[in-house]
Curated annotation (Swiss-Prot):
Catalyzes the complicated ring closure reaction between the two acyclic compounds 1-deoxy-D-xylulose-5-phosphate (DXP) and 3-amino-2-oxopropyl phosphate (1-amino-acetone-3-phosphate or AAP) to form pyridoxine 5'-phosphate (PNP) and inorganic phosphate. The record marks 151 as: Transition state stabilizer. GO terms for cellular component: cytosol. The gene is pdxJ. This is Pyridoxine 5'-phosphate synthase. It is found in: Cytoplasm.
Length: 239
């Protein structure tokens, strides 16, 4: 059965807006797990714009389910991951000027660097996932890199303006799931997933984990973290 990986980056974004200690993503992660999230996701960016090293250190000790660390494939980040040992690392592209991750990794262009990072992480006992667009050639390259999983970038699906466009994106995602499964890779998905568009996506099957942050945090402001997480878990469970 598919699982929810709760991304708590936006809690850290609110905290950093005032430079204080609240709200604390560590507390949000604990509440999320109590409500049914089966993993916690954080993105430690090179510019530390939201999640801080302190958050990673504490979450590594307190998360009871699975900690998924999103990060760039840099020497610094690989060293941090090998020291803190999250259960999973998801390699993602980074641009300093972007508000959020805008697209998948270009694994084809950066195959050597990504393969080197994947090997170091896996040698350290960490499961590795690559955040990629639902592109057949990128998935083939991801498999060559030695990664265990792909995380399908669902942004184009989430941004589709109408059902015909959304349906085309779903077909691409479905083909990506099938190819990854064929070559023995696990499949996760994330980016732009909300309480409406999760249903057709989850109905495809083949996705092990949905990493969702913004839509859950937006709802949590209005109804509380417990209700927001439980609502999403229910949608994933009964899609």
């Amino acid at each position: 059965m598919a699982k929810l990986g709760l991304n708590v980056d936006h809690v850290a974004t609110v905290r950093q807006a005032r430079g204080g200690m609240e709200p604390d993503p560590v507390t949000a992660a604990a509440l999320g797990e109590l409500a049914g999230a089966e993993g916690i996701t954080i993105h430690l960016r090179e510019d530390r714009r939201h999640i801080q090293d302190r958050d990673l250190e504490i979450l590594r000790r307190t998360v009871k389910t699975k900690l998924n660390l999103e990060m760039a494939a840099t020497q610094e980040m690989v060293r941090i991951a090998l020291r803190t040992k999250p259960e999973q690392v998801t390699l993602v592209p980074e641009k300093r000027q972007e508000l959020t991750t805008e697209g998948g990794l270009d694994v084809i262009l950066n195959l050597k660097a990504i393969t080197d990072a994947v090997k170091r992480l896996r040698d350290g006992g960490i499961v590795v996932s690559l955040f990629v667009d639902p592109d057949q050639e990128q998935i083939k390259a991801a498999n060559k890199s030695g990664a265990d999983y792909i995380e399908i970038h669902t942004g184009a699906y989430a941004d589709a303006p109408d059902w015909p466009s959304q349906k085309r994106q779903l077909e691409e995602i479905d083909a990506a799931i099938k190819l990854a499964s064929k070559v023995g890779m696990g499949v996760n998905a994330g980016h732009g997933i909300n309480y409406v568009n999760i249903k057709p996506l989850a109905a495809l099957g083949g996705i092990e984990e949905y990493n969702i942050g913004h839509s859950i945090m937006a709802r949590a402001i209005l109804v509380g973290m417990d209700r927001a997480v439980k609502d999403m878990v229910e949608l994933i469970k009964y899609a």
